[in-house]
A protein has these predicted regions:
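Small-residue helix-packing motif on alpha-helices
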Residues: 30, 40, 58, 194-201, ...
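A short glycine-threonine-serine/GTX helix/turn-capping micro-motif
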Residues: 166-175, 196, 224
Length: 256
């Protein structure tokens, strides 16, 4: 079965790259639409997939359609292509705030609809994606969707009521992590370390720490305690972070 993308920006490109690397689809089984010939040329050169400037061609030639345009263009795109949609199609939205009910309504008929929230680390094959689907999507079809998202990271199926939480803890948080890496690097630079080297130390520390959480299954607090020696510099740093509201600031940012 062919797969289609309406829009082919950074996120769609990351998703397609993952699918191709894992061998889920061949290049000629993926069709993407772009607004401009320049965009189509870029997609062909970077990904080697079939390209078109016509969104209708994507829908007519595939049964699994990803909406990979910016959220403000969703309604316009669905109004454009809903005449070609059939009950055999599965429509996948990857934009925040577009609910399953909203997507189904804008499709103009009862359809198989999936909502997913990938994040920017998908661009390096380390994404985290939350997925939910309406009742028309079979377990087998949902498994197929998850195989796709697993090709560029990890996947969790969640009830739709948690998708806003997914957006916060997974979609927005990379920006906060980048700020933390930058702050750690700044501190190292202040002590004389070259900036490029400081970024390496800070980023690898976060990468390794994250892998410890995922691979050991231990509670993050327990892992933290393992690093904190009595009367040591690490526990003193923890004290300073707690004093300055580190946890509260993160909590409030994710609640916003």
């Amino acid at each position: 079965m062919k797969i289609g993308f309406i829009g082919c920006g950074n996120m769609a490109s990351a998703m397609i790259s993952g699918m191709l690397k894992k061998g889920l689809y061949k290049k000629d089984e993926i069709i993407v639409s772009n607004l401009t010939e320049e965009g189509s040329k870029r997609s062909r050169e970077k990904l080697g997939v079939v390209t078109t400037l016509d969104n209708h061609e994507v829908v007519k030639n595939t049964k699994l359609v990803f909406l990979a345009v910016k959220p403000q263009f969703y309604e316009e795109v669905l109004n454009e292509v809903k005449g070609e949609l059939t009950p055999e199609h599965t429509v996948v939205g990857i934009a925040p705030g577009k609910t399953l009910a909203w997507l189904e309504e804008k499709c103009g008929q009862p359809l198989k609809v999936v909502r997913m929230m990938p994040n920017t680390p998908a661009q390096v094959g380390e994404g985290m994606t939350g997925v939910c689907a309406n009742e028309k999507v079979s377990a087998e079809e949902l498994t197929q969707i998850c195989e796709i998202t697993d090709s560029f990271g990890r996947t969790e199926v969640v009830p739709e009521r948690l998708m806003d939480a997914v957006s916060a803890v997974s979609g927005c948080s990379p920006a906060y992590v980048f700020m933390f890496i930058e702050a750690m690097a700044d501190a190292a630079v202040a002590q004389g370390m070259p900036r490029k080297q400081a970024y390496q130390f800070a980023a690898q520390a976060l990468l390794g720490s994250a892998k410890m959480v995922l691979e050991t299954g231990m509670h993050p607090g327990e892992l933290k305690d393992m690093v904190c020696s009595p009367a040591g510099t690490t526990i003193e740093g923890v004290r300073i972070l707690e004093k300055n509201g580190f946890r509260s600031a993160v909590f409030e940012a994710l609640q916003g």
